[in-house]
C-alpha cells in the first residue's frame, strides 16, 4: 500500500495521456476528442477509458470543499487529457451556470436527518437529471470537433420516449456549429413532455412526432 502511495505521489501533477478503446475492438485506441466526436466506434462498440484514474485520499477529501464546477473540471481533467485547461474550464463554465440551474450550487445536497442526504439533480432547465450530462455534452462535442480539425456542422438525431429529448433540445439550443432533430412517438409521451418539446426555443432545433412506438 505504501509503495502504491509513493507511486501515485510521484505521478501527481504529471501529464498522463488517457486513451479510449472500443468494447468490440481492444486493439484500436483513440483520444478523448476523437471518441467524443465519433460517439460509437466503427464496429458499433462503445468507447471506454483504457483505465480508471487513481486518486490519493487527500485528493478525494479535497473534493468535498470544491464547488460543483470545480469538481467537474477536476474529474474531467483526469479523463479528457487531450483537452487544455482552458478548453475544459470553458466547457464547464458554459454548461453549469446559475442562469440555467437556478443556483450556483448546481446540484445541492439536502440533509434529511443524521446519515440521510438527498442529491438534488432536478435544478436544470428541464427539471430532469439528464440535464447534468446534456448541458455539457454540446460544448465537449464542439470543442472535440475543433481539436480534430473538423469543419462540418454537427447534426444530432434523437429518438425519445421521455425526458431525453427535451434535455437534449435544451442542451444543444443555439450552440454554434450544431443542429438537433428529435423524434418522439405521438402517443408515447406525456402531454407535459410533448408540450416541452414542441414549444422548445432555439434557431437550430426541430421536433417531429412519429406515428408508431419508440422502438
What are these regions (language model features)?
Residues 6, 14-215:
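PLP-dependent amino-acid enzyme catalytic core
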